[in-house]
């Protein structure tokens, strides 16, 4: 065994997070680590890599017991981590991000070899399918491209044990395929991987073994070839989940929102589509197709160069999010940490921000109304929290996403836009979010959902609009939906539009 963790215990402020957990890695394997948000996966890996110190238990790396007090010590032993949360320095260039702390210099002079770093950065990212200049400012790139920089950074350390924590959350299917090909090539060279993900399809495609944690405890380890989706879900949640997606019984009504010939130069062009009350319109496409840019423009985050937005049969002038909200539009961003939540604020304060008119009397916030709103929405969305004062950053990914959705449900939207609504969310919380979306649609809310997960798009959508390089290629009816058909149009096939 290249890694042996035995009897690991860890508590924070007296609250046990890991209780007698054991975990092993065989050299050259890709080992999945699964569990619901809050199960202890990331904490266990942070102990392995020296970010946290264990309270008790043993950790052996390559047969030697270790007591890392700093991540640099783990890195020196050949461990690298691709974190779920981006660690990009937005003001630095792509190359500077890849080489931060490891800059190439001219001997004793200390002068940085910028051209060499730019070239190496471009070569490494090209291996992952990303064509970008090393001199490009990292903050200008999309979340998905920033994720590829994080992955390249870890791969450049020449580590022989790599921990990947939700590495594909912001990637398209094509980028995932390229990443997996790279991982398999490294595996052939003896590199060992821990793969943390909530995406069952990826785990069953890539990994050889899987370990499941639940509530900070070790549940078991299975050989992938000898287990099933249902068995792993039951290990994770302690019960069978039943059908993955809600039964599709939606009956769309009148057109709620329509966009006509909407254009934003360099991002999307001449897009026309509509969404009806009581339907879920999926928007699919590869990275760079313009999906997020389109919905952000509808919501007023971005300014359209031309085109029109119509709501309830009337042309709407939306020049900012405040005007979109006034028109009854809610927006769940793909990046909940920077655009969806103020993570240092409490749950109560995050929910209150979009609902001030509902909880205020004569410009004064009513604590009673504020608490009542929290209790109503927390109950409706099954939020697991100690109370309204708990900081958003201390919640699991699934509960953070529920808070983002909750703050928009408070405004009782007519139209709800969700951009990657289940990114970084565990299988149990995903099902709860799917149920919430379906119930909202049944109540007459018009829902637009952008998602990179094709099973999610197919499982939830009434219709699917497919984009390619900023153009709307086709709108598929529910009975036309399949992964093959969506990918056909997402890669540029049959350049025509039908609504």
UniProtKB/Swiss-Prot annotation:
It is found in: Cell membrane. The keyword Repeat applies. GO terms for molecular function: ABC-type D-ribose transporter activity; ATP binding; ATP hydrolysis activity. It catalyses: D-ribose(out) + ATP + H2O = D-ribose(in) + ADP + phosphate + H(+). Residues 3-240, 250-494 form the ABC transporter domain. The keyword Transcription does not apply. Its main location: membrane. Keywords: ATP-binding, Cell membrane, Membrane, Nucleotide-binding, Repeat, Sugar transport, Translocase, Transport. ATP binds at residues 35-42. It is an enzyme of class 7 (translocase). It comes from the Bacteria. It is a peripheral membrane protein. CDD domains: ABC_Carb_Monos_I, ABC_Carb_Monos_II. GO terms for cellular component: plasma membrane. Its EC number is 7.5.2.7. The complex is composed of an ATP-binding protein (RbsA), two transmembrane proteins (RbsC) and a solute-binding protein (RbsB). Belongs to the ABC transporter superfamily. Ribose importer (TC 3.A.1.2.1) family. Part of the ABC transporter complex RbsABC involved in ribose import. Responsible for energy coupling to the transport system. PANTHER family: CARBOHYDRATE TRANSPORT ATP-BINDING PROTEIN MG119-RELATED, D-ALLOSE IMPORT ATP-BINDING PROTEIN ALSA-RELATED. This is Ribose import ATP-binding protein RbsA.
């Amino acid at each position: 065994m290249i890694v042996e963790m035995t009897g690991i215990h860890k508590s924070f402020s007296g609250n046990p997070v890991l209780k007698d957990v054991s975990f092993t890695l065989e050299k050259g394997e890709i080992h999945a680590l699964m569990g619901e948000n809050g199960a202890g996966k990331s904490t266990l890996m942070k102990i392995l890599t020296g970010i946290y110190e264990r309270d008790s238990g043993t950790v052996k790396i390559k047969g030697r017991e270790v007591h890392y007090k700093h991540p640099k010590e783990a890195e020196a032993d050949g461990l690298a981590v691709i974190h779920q949360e981006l660690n990009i320095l937005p003001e630095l260039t792509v190359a500077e991000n890849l080489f931060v702390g490891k800059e190439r210099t001219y001997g004793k002079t200390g002068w940085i070899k910028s051209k060499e770093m730019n070239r190496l950065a471009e070569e490494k990212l090209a291996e992952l399918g990303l064509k970008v200049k090393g001199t490009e400012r990292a903050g200008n790139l999309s979340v998905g491209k920033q994720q590829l920089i994080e992955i390249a950074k870890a791969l450049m350390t020449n580590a022989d044990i790599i921990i990947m924590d939700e590495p594909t959350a912001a990637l398209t299917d094509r980028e995932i395929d390229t990443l997996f090909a790279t991982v398999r090539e490294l595996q052939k060279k003896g590199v060992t991987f821990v793969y943390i993900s909530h995406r069952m399809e990826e785990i069953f495609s890539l990994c050889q073994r899987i370990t499941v944690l639940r509530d900070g405890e070790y549940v078991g380890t299975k050989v992938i070839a000898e287990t099933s989706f249902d068995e792993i879900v039951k290990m994770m949640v302690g019960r069978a989940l039943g059908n993955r997606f809600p039964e599709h019984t939606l009956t769309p009504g009148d057109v709620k929102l329509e966009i006509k010939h909407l254009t934003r130069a360099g991002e999307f062009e001449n897009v026309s589509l509509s969404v009806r009350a009581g339907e879920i319109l999926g928007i699919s496409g590869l990275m760079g197709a313009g999906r997020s840019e389109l919905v952000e423009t509808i919501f007023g985050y971005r300014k359209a160069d031309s085109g029109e937005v119509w709501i309830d049969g009337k042309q709407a002038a939306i020049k900012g999010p405040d005007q979109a909200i006034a028109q009854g539009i809610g927006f769940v961003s793909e990046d909940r940490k920077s655009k969806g939540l103020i993570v240092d604020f409490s749950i109560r304060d995050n929910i209150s921000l979009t609902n001030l008119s509902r909880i205020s009397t004569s410009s004064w916030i009513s604590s009673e109304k504020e608490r009542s709103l929290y209790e109503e929405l927390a109950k409706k969305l099954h939020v697991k929290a100690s109370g309204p004062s708990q900081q958003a950053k201390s919640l699991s990914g699934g509960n953070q996403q529920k808070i983002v959705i909750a703050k928009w449900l408070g405004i009782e939207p007519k139209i709800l836009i969700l951009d990657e609504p289940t990114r970084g969310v565990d299988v149990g919380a995903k099902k709860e979010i799917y149920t919430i979306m379906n119930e909202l649609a049944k109540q007459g809310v018009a829902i637009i959902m952008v998602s990179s997960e094709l099973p999610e798009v197919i499982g939830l959508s009434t219709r699917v609009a497919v984009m390619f390089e900023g153009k709307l290629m086709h709108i598929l009816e529910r009975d036309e939906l399949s992964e093959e058909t969506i990918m056909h149009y997402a890669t540029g096939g049959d350049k025509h539009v039908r609504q």
